[in-house]
Amino acid sequence: MTAPDPTAHSETPGQQTVPGPQSAPGPQDSPGGRVGGAVHAVLAAETIFGALGIALAGTILGIAAPDTIAWMILIPAAIVLIARTRPWRQSLGVRGLGIAVIVGVLFALYGSSMFTAINHLQVGTAVAISMTVGLLIGLIHGQGKRRFLSPALALAGCVVFAYQALPGTVDGKAMLSSMMESLWAGVLLLAMVMMKGLASHLGYDRGAVSGVGFIIAALGFGLRDATIHGIPALNGRFIAVIIAVSCLMFVRPTVLRRIVDQQADARTQARYNVFFPAVAMVAGVVLLGQVPSLLDLVGLALITGALWIMSGVTIMPRRIFGARGSGEVTAD
């Protein structure tokens, strides 16, 4: 998936965290009660690579529209996932194909919204705002008074970001519109996880569902896009960036996630997710030359604090589209 889980939280025995885009509740504790250095390295890699993928897409926004980039990056991921899972050997049926189409469409829409947002916002700002949506799950289903402080800090962070949008100006309106796109991306992020959780609950291979969904969505959005924007010039650099973004955002989680789910507890995963917006802001500085202002840093600090607080909140109910018979949720 595209970004670390913005809604993963700590658990207590018999309780389960809410799933998120890339990370999902693994075992309550890692083997031996400790997480090894290799797992920490994988979690750090997930955070860094995901942020790099989004920022790298920003380098070709001047060449192609956000919608175009969103469906194009689905193609390399679809090829890899289909080659790995061989969905033709599985029985998806009409229901499975329907879920696959929905998953593919949600991924394409998420990419379009996020890339539209970073057209006028810093990468870290767009990612931070999108991750605030997941805090609502903790607010509704969480336990303890801390869950009320988290959304308050997140709201304050969003206000700080919005304060920089000069009212009545073209740039100000574009920034506010991009902030709304970021929030919408957060909603789509949660919807993607719910659909993949449903696919797992019904016994479908999530890699196969994603692969089939990606290729169908890419064909559909590609045909639509060709009639509106036309296909941009496919030079070597453009194709290389598309493949790199696809690998960083979609292929990477499939490879690394199995290690994390088997060995890292939910709290550890949630702690790493907290720093995803900060890493995304650094990626924006390195790849796009985006220099954050003091207000950007304040807003980022507030939202990071909100994510940190919520990462320690226990979430109920126990089961949200969990794997059949296990009570757990996993995500590719």
Give the ranges of each region predicted by the language model.
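Glycine-/small-residue-enriched transmembrane alpha-helix faces in small-molecule transporters
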Residues: 1-68, 72, 105, 109-113, ...
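Transmembrane alpha-helices of multi-pass small-molecule transport proteins
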Residues: 2-11, 61-109, 132-137, 187-194, ...
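Juxtamembrane helix-entry segments on the extracytoplasmic side of multipass membrane proteins
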Residues: 34-38, 62-71, 92-96, 164-187, ...
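Hydrophobic alpha-helical transmembrane segments of multi-pass membrane transport proteins
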Residues: 44, 48-55, 101-116, 160, ...
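Hydrophobic/aromatic residues within transmembrane alpha-helices
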Residues: 59-60, 69, 117, 122, ...
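Helix-helix packing/entry segments at the starts of transmembrane helices
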Residues: 71-72, 126-129, 195-216, 250-286
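Hydrophobic transmembrane alpha-helices of multi-pass small-molecule transport proteins
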Residues: 81, 132, 146-167, 274-275, ...
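Cytoplasmic-side transmembrane-helix entry/capping segments in multi-pass membrane proteins
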Residues: 94-103, 144-157, 178, 203-214, ...
